[in-house]
Swiss-Prot record:
It catalyses: dUTP + H2O = dUMP + diphosphate + H(+). Its EC number is 3.6.1.23. InterPro entries: dUTPase, dUTPase-like, dUTPase-like_sf, dUTPase_trimeric. Keywords: Hydrolase, Magnesium, Metal-binding, Nucleotide metabolism. Its cofactor is Mg(2+). Pfam families: dUTPase. One of its GO terms (biological process) is dUMP biosynthetic process. This enzyme is involved in nucleotide metabolism: it produces dUMP, the immediate precursor of thymidine nucleotides and it decreases the intracellular concentration of dUTP so that uracil cannot be incorporated into DNA. This is Deoxyuridine 5'-triphosphate nucleotidohydrolase. It is an enzyme of class 3 (hydrolase).
Length: 152
């Protein structure tokens, strides 16, 4: 069963009039984030460049939750545009504007217009680790193999 939590959200002045994040299907994990750039001034993201796109939103997550900002697969597949620091983490105590750091890996400039869906946000529970220093770690079947050691 899906757990429902309450997240407080506020539009900043430049985000007024834009829809709040919403799930596009009944079983979607991510809510769409929308660009809050001026109507008459879209951002043009040149190939190989990145830009911080405003969403015009601030949120207050419950304690022990985070929001992950992830790419939209359609933008990546069609235009080579993705979230540079994916997943970006929004901590429960952050109260600033949600920004989406997009990069254009494509070969053509990409225009980011007001109201365009630019990323998705997944709300997830947080576990906090307590580290214990030890002299040696227990053995495992994998050992120290990394960077492709379990396959091709």
């Amino acid at each position: 069963m899906t757990q429902k939590i309450t997240v407080s959200i506020r539009h900043l002045p430049h985000g007024e009039g834009l829809p709040l994040p919403e799930y596009q299907t009944a079983h979607a994990a991510g809510l769409d984030l929308i660009a809050a750039v001026p109507q008459d001034a879209p951002l043009t993201l040149q190939p190989g460049r990145y830009v911080l796109v405003p969403t015009g939103l601030t949120i207050a997550l419950p304690e022990n939750y985070e929001a992950q900002v992830r790419p939209r697969s359609g933008l990546a597949a069609k235009h080579g545009v993705t979230v540079l620091n994916a997943p970006g983490t929004i901590d429960a105590d952050y109260r600033g504007e949600i920004g989406v750091l997009l990069i254009n890996h494509g070969t053509e400039p990409f225009a980011i217009r007001r109201g365009e869906r630019i990323a998705q946000m997944v709300i997830a529970p947080v576990s906090r680790a307590q580290f214990v220093a030890v002299e040696a770690l227990p053995e495992s079947g994998r050992g120290a193999g990394g960077f492709g050691s379990t396959g091709r």
